[in-house]
Amino acid sequence: MILQNKIPSIYHSIFPELLDIEFPEEQIATCDTCTLCRSPQSPYINTKCCTYQPTLVNFLLGGVFVDDDINLAIGKERIQSQIKSRAGVTPYGIIPSNAYIQREKQANSHDFWSRPHQLVESIRCPYSHKGLCTVWKYRENLCVTFFCSSIGGAAGKTFWKKVNTYLKMAETSLAQYAMLQLGWPPAKIKTDAVTAADFKFEEEDGIINDAKYAALWGDWIGREEEFYRSCFNIIKNIDASTFKQITGQTREILEAAITDTQKYFQLSNLPDFLLLHPDVVTDKSNENHALLVLGEITAEISSALLPLVYSFNGKRQTVEVFQLGYNVLFNMSELVEELREKGMLIKP
């Protein structure tokens, strides 16, 4: 698979150098058959991993409005509702509101697998509808690059983190460029990615300070949708040369980092089958924990995970064993990484 298949089409003419970079197909974490939904007890049964509000920058929002694709109709309506509420609505894009951030903090105060269903669903992405994304063609960086389990293990996660950083850099730089081209005062343009903390128009209780909101938007107040459309019309005509000029050395460094990490990703791809080393001895003397021993090398794991480890028998596909883990609300990524590094999981 190549990055062109993952990156939204709006970027294809802007940074074509990245499009042909190959990577192993992510077979464990797939959106259509979400691993987080395998167990009926999963708190994510109705949300998948979409317990996150993406920051849609100005030109991505404009893309949703300009595009006639029927699959974006619900997304348009939801963005229009956000604009009407004014919560999180800025010239840079629509960011998570203070109210959303507070709900997110409350959810994150619980362990990942033990979060209450109601709390998890309170932080469902506002663009999610019946398990599908209503703004998919114009999704943001994390929605392109997040995998709860990568087929490349730690190397895969490192690769996607670099791609994520690159896309976030592109979003931020292009959003600022669009504002500049539309006559926004340069001294008022923030040069970093923005968060709710950068603006003071929303109180902690969620009440919007209309005067501060009007001051933020200036002459564009009441024409937010038009502004976002204008941003998109600017960015859609940008070529690769202009993008390079805008992003400079930061882009060069990140492109090199993506190329470097891609090599390790390819080399670290999990085999289709894994086998627990025949010489591994299991010490079960502790009721709650088991000690896997291979010569002088040891690994301590929860006794409840032994059946999963034994499932690596050289006959069961690696992806299937990961699925068994999610069936009991356990992500096997770190454990598999550790056992492979210690030589306890090998190719049959």
Language model segments and positions:
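Bulky hydrophobic/aromatic "packing anchor" residues in well-ordered structure
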Residues: 50, 143, 275-276, 281-282, ...
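Short acidic (Asp/Glu) and glycine-rich catalytic loops that position anionic groups and cofactors
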Residues: 144-147, 287-289, 315
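Residue-level signal for threonine
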Residues: 57-60, 277-279, 302
